Amino acid sequence: MEWIERLNEAIGYIEENLAGEIDYEQLGRIACCSSYHFQRMFSYMAGMPLSEYIRRRRMSLAAVDLQGGDAKISDVAAKYGYSSPTAFNRAFQSIHGIAPSTVRAEGVSVKSFPPITFRIIVKGVGEMNYRIETKEAFRITGVSVPLEKEIEKNFAVIPSKWQEISVNGTLQRLIQMMDREPMGVLGVSTCNGEEAWRYYIAVSSSKEGEGLEEYIVPAATWAIFPGEGTNESIQELERRIVTEWLPTSGYEYADAPDIEVYISPDPQNAKYEVWIPVVKAG
């Protein structure tokens, strides 16, 4: 329950700062996790990216401000963080379907998006297999791409990198270098601590590879969930981990990378494991 309470405290912080700057790192601190893990949890639990939720809340309040008085559009835009009237107009129309200049007209309808409240709902769903393992640090080698701090901006970047290395032969080269546990092609999101965020496509290997990068995955305790199926099934498993397992598990996110292990990378029926770093709650 503490985990859910912290998420709701983070929502309270967002509400207090809708007319100011919202610090994603502070959200992570309130929720006792990295800003990356907070954004992932929020997206799965709320059904929308964090940035979209914030935009909807701001535009909901902006409509109230414009309807209820003589506030100038430029002042309301500035209040909610838009330095450009054009950007504000675009955001307002995307939510309400009308221009902000027409909001005071008789009979005009706007949308209201109230604040989210998280709670635990127990329902009868399928079982989840997992194991808890504590592992020493291990070396991976491969290629990486930088990630944005707003994770939805990376949705096209990561698949593009997988496609690139599949075509240019790098993926097959990595598979041949693989000689240590965990055995499989790894997708590693290093979005923890103060380091720059990166996504690695790599293998656990003792070998050196010309033109390849290396990263040391820190020692950590991992909750490991096996699965099989398409890429969509991986996303569904990750959603269930965050929304069903984590809130009642007695664990919370640790400050370490997220890992996907592709044991058999058949795009139609892959065998994989999802590793999330955990510590005992409290």
Model-derived regions: residue spans:
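Short, Lys/Arg-enriched, disordered terminal segments
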Residues: 1-4, 280-282
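Conserved hydrophobic/aromatic pocket- or pore-lining residues that grip, position, or stack substrates
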Residues: 14, 38, 241
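Append "Primarily bacterial transcriptional regulators
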Residues: 25-34, 38, 42, 76-83, ...
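Alpha-helical structural signal in soluble globular domains
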Residues: 41, 45-46, 53, 95-96, ...
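A solvent-exposed interaction/effector surface
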Residues: 64-67, 74, 78, 83-282
